[in-house]
């Protein structure tokens, strides 16, 4: 019997996607800016960058929000993924959401960041 695991529904995947989206945010944003700048050179680039950042951080948070810090499997997944990039992504996300006064998101991310410091 073959067992299939839907990797997209695992905490290790969610943490990896969170980290990847934050790390690659600047690439995504510059691609959006480049695309729209070709269509309309008079477009407000700073506003467009802000929208690109918003899309990236919101999508990254979508994945991170699936983490249940009280679940042992989720804790183990964080332990397996912990590195400088994850810590930086968590810190950057807190700063980003503070700018928009989304303190519930900041508090959730801070719980995960605090958990990483216990490892």
Give the location of each predicted region.
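Long, low-complexity, acidic Ser/Pro- and Gly-enriched intrinsically disordered regions
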Residues: 1-98, 108-119
């Amino acid at each position: 019997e073959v067992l299939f695991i839907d990797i997209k529904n695992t905490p290790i995947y969610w943490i990896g996607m969170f980290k990847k989206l934050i790390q690659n945010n600047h690439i995504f944003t510059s691609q959006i800016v480049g695309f729209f700048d070709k269509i309309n050179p008079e477009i407000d680039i700073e506003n467009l960058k802000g929208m690109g950042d918003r899309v990236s951080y919101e999508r990254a948070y979508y994945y991170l929000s699936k983490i249940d810090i009280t679940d042992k499997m989720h804790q183990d997944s964080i332990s397996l993924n912990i590195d400088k990039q994850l810590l930086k992504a968590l810190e950057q996300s807190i700063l980003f959401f503070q700018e928009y006064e989304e303190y519930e998101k900041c508090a959730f991310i801070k719980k995960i960041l605090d958990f990483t410091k216990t490892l």
